[in-house]
Amino acid sequence: MIDTAKAVADLAWLVEIGADEAINDQPTDWTQVASRRAPTAREAGPARSPASAPPAAAPGRSATPPEKKSPALATAPALGGADAPPGSPLGMTEARASARGAAMAATTLEDLHKALLAFDGCPLKQTASSTVFADGNPKARVMLIGEAPGEQEDRQGKPFVGPAGALLDKMLAAIGLDRHAEEPDKAVYISNILPWRPPGNRNPTDSEIAACLPFIQRHVEIADPDILVFLGGISAKTLLAKTEGITRLRGRWFDYGSPGLTRPLPALALLHPAYLLRNPGAKRETWRDLLSLREKLRGLPPRP
């Protein structure tokens, strides 16, 4: 018999690490699927009367599906809608505009941190314990960008300090990098797409990512690293404006551009350390990706 509780837990874990594609046991004949058409009004039969309509959603459950999470927000227009999200005094359009203005006004990391602390356009701030800004050496040549704080990060106010962070530190040490190193060539600087923990460690919604996106974009511009590393699917897909899952993006080099940068930055996508904790068999390919990062770093010209 199927262990339902285990199946649900496994599915929740897959969603948490960014899995976004389902593969069937048998190949799908898309030519047959495409040939199917929706029934016409005549074929579908008469419209339902109110008495035969589906029952309303039970109390405490939404009658509409949850907001779909999609990538490619880096180039998406501002989200519309004047209604404010729960816990936010701003509507989506106003929140995005407010974030963009506050982020662009910052010229130093300290300014950006203060602007983030003063920003109230994302409802996640209302439920989080801490604003998780960054950790490591801001002068490092390598900047790592994760997805969102977890429980330990929310408590301590720093990114990657839980079990996944411990593994990340070991991964970095294996190629001679350390978040606490003073020498920029041996240090890393770490931040996240979102500075606030989503309740229950759920994936952030499109609107939550969009509200915070201008801050991480400006963060990259001010820190001005030589290499970017995206940890996990949400980070990679959002900042690279890609639709592929992380298993297809990992190990590949991309050019990351932004108006505030003087040149495109080489960017590498890696599997999230949380994924590696649950799927140790993927460490082999991640090791190859880390070696690629080391070679790219060694090939950089000296900083002036």
Report residues per predicted region.
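Non-catalytic accessory regions outside enzyme or core folds
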Residues: 1-24
